[in-house]
């Protein structure tokens, strides 16, 4: 067996056993999507959402929010998952709105324990939001909802920070 075939076999076996693709194997795919200039920025963002939602079993809703011009609000960008009514989120409201103000990652292991949480679905149990910075300015964020209680680890945070740094190069 050639090295490439062995790697493919190992990766497929890992995914079958654990139900998720390791973050390190997703990084080159994220980079490849970002570098694909044949697609629009929104198409690339959607492809990243699809990649994450497909390969990480506890990522049940994956989307991007971006600052809406000069307004103190976020506007929903590309996403995959259940439709949401939250297409505009004022700064400070909900987890996403808080990240727009704090410029910090926000990991919520149990959304029912959060006072300032905007419910998108009764199925959502946890959320993670990571800001996207361009030249030191918070321009948006990636938002992940999970139907699994407390699924996010430090590895998720580091991986999503990587994704956000790659996405930042599109702007």
Q: Locations of the language-model features?
A:
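Regulatory sensory and allosteric helical modules in signal-transduction proteins
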Residues: 66-119
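Low-complexity, intrinsically disordered or signal/transmembrane-proximal segments
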Residues: 2-5
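Sensory-domain boundary capping and coupling elements
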Residues: 133-146
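Juxtadomain coupling helices with adjacent low-complexity linkers
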Residues: 23, 31-34, 146-171
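A short, aliphatic-rich beta-strand micro-motif
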Residues: 126-133
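Short hydrophobic/aromatic beta-strand element in the GNAT-like acyltransferase core
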Residues: 61, 129, 141
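Short loop/turn motifs at secondary-structure junctions and domain boundaries
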Residues: 56, 119-124
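Intrinsically disordered, low-complexity terminal regulatory regions
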Residues: 10, 14-79, 83
